[in-house]
Amino acid sequence: MKNAVKRIGVLTSGGDAPGMNACIRAVVRSANARGIECVGIRRGYQGLISGDIVEMDNASVSRIINRGGTILYSARCDEFRTKEGQEKAYATCKLIGLDGLVAIGGDGTFRGAQDLSKFGISVVGIPGTIDNDIVCTDYTIGFDTAANTAVECMDKLRDTMQSHERCSVVEVMGHRAGYLALYVGVAIGATAVLVPERSYDFEKHVAEKIRRARISGKTNFMIVVAEGAASGMAVGEQIKKENMERYDDIHSDCLLAPKYGNDEGY
């Protein structure tokens, strides 16, 4: 039985995530193993509009499995949000003979893929985002690496915190989702974790937790803040203000964990 699909495209869009290159490699080699041609679309949906494509075979994805970022590059594309932009992208798909498209990215990438599917293009979305905010999957590509990287950074920070008896506020990415902050907070044993899914009261969810930890004998504290919940700097300043009245022997810093980019747009 012959394949109905003979030629597909693959693109990465939005913020890059660890593991995207490994995913590109898997798509290309799986397609080639089934006799399906594969083309790479560079710079996401912008490349689909402008026709920025490259033929891909097994050799073109050799030795990229451990590389960070994405060899196909990524870019935001406001034009694709418009009907005219989507029509241009569809025209490119027909011009280069695509029977299907594989889109790797987060929620914005998936929205773009859904819009394109309305033109009759077969689309597969592969969740690649550190935010871990895509339904129907336990983990998205890049989430585990981002979580472990943040934990490694905070473990190193803790050594200094213990030496100086400090309270540190660490803001991590996640866009409007608190998965990354929550997983990291649990892994490092944070005193408090603030996530956008739940509103918080500073006195109840931060100050009181620090107070109880202090009474139990702890001399250093770490507060993890998801970027969608609050500003890490603002929380740190509020802790400093409280410290002037209650904890004059505790210092407060604010460290921004390494940022990888999110997938808000197409």
Language-model-detected regions and their locations in the chain:
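Glycine-rich oxoanion-binding loops at beta->alpha junctions
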Residues: 1-2, 48-103, 109, 141-153
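N-terminal phosphate-binding or glycine-rich loops at protein starts, especially the Walker A/P-loop
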Residues: 2-49
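Short glycine-rich or small-residue beta-strand-to-loop segments that form or flank ligand, phosphate
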Residues: 7-15, 70-75, 100-103, 168-171, ...
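Gly-rich Lys/Arg/Thr-decorated short loops/hinges at beta-loop-alpha junctions or inter-strand turns
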Residues: 7-10, 64-76, 128-138, 163-165, ...
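A glycine- and small-aliphatic-rich helix-loop capping segment at beta-alpha/alpha-beta transitions
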Residues: 25-34, 54-60, 115-125, 141-145, ...
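Short gly/pro/ser/thr-enriched loop/turn and capping motifs at secondary-structure boundaries
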Residues: 45-48, 110, 129-134, 200-202
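Accessory alpha-helical/coil subdomains and C-terminal extensions
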Residues: 103-105, 111, 115, 122, ...
